[in-house]
Amino acid sequence: MAQEIEKTNNDHLVQSSDPEHPANLIPELCRKFYNWGWVTGTGGGTSIRRGDHIFIAPSGVQKELIQPHNIFVLEFPTPKYPPSDRKYIRKPLELKPSACTPLFLTAFERGAGCCIHTHSQWAVLVTLLVEREKGPDACFEISNIEQIKGIPRGKGKGMLGFFDTLRIPIIENTAFEEDLTESLEKAMDQYPDTYAVLVRRHGIYVWGDDVAKAKTQCESLDYLFQLAVEMHKLGLPWVK
């Protein structure tokens, strides 16, 4: 297997005329996220699961310039640790795998079809406001805002309503991305209905059953975070 990967690099896995193919979707999404200010300076990442394959954007590449041939492909399931045991079936030889990989795998192990990691300024700001106002162990909470309806209640439970309170757990940042994995897993266990985890002074991980749901949930959350920051400036409470 290793010799075959080295010989052909399984390029056929990222070659498709289908615009919905993960190798085509990931570059398109990364360009959008770059234009929205979510993934500046090569930060952030995106991964999509299709069947028993996981497609992941590379590390260290300007997100607006990613091309299908830059995409890594993993077999799924695959070990998270050690990195050397991960079952890559396509590795662009000149690029490094994403440091987000074990965190993406954590979402996929819980049934996600797509996981997005952004460095949104609004996400970072709300983690700082929550820490200052409520302490380091508090989660982000907001209610009575229409856009909350864009976030699921939990697997198979429908969507949140206007009068519901949205809660997003917050974990502390670490010096290295992969070291966030344990905290992410713990937050997912403590908040089993969540589809997102904020990382203080860093950004957010958002996942969904498929690409469209992950993207729209990420958009809804970013809207809510920006609104929360502006509400705080005006002295308006996030929860009524």
Swiss-Prot record:
This is Methylthioribulose-1-phosphate dehydratase. The active site is at residue 146. Pathway: Amino-acid biosynthesis; L-methionine biosynthesis via salvage pathway; L-methionine from S-methyl-5-thio-alpha-D-ribose 1-phosphate: step 2/6. Catalyzes the dehydration of methylthioribulose-1-phosphate (MTRu-1-P) into 2,3-diketo-5-methylthiopentyl-1-phosphate (DK-MTP-1-P). Residues 1-20 are annotated as: Disordered. It catalyses: 5-(methylsulfanyl)-D-ribulose 1-phosphate = 5-methylsulfanyl-2,3-dioxopentyl phosphate + H2O. Keywords: Amino-acid biosynthesis, Cytoplasm, Lyase, Metal-binding, Methionine biosynthesis, Zinc. GO terms for molecular function: methylthioribulose 1-phosphate dehydratase activity; zinc ion binding. Binds 1 zinc ion per subunit. InterPro entries: Aldolase_II/adducin_N (IPR001303), Aldolase_II/adducin_N_sf (IPR036409), MethylthioRu-1-P_deHdtase_MtnB (IPR017714), Salvage_MtnB_euk (IPR027514). Zn(2+) binds at residues 117, 119, 202. Belongs to the aldolase class II family. MtnB subfamily.
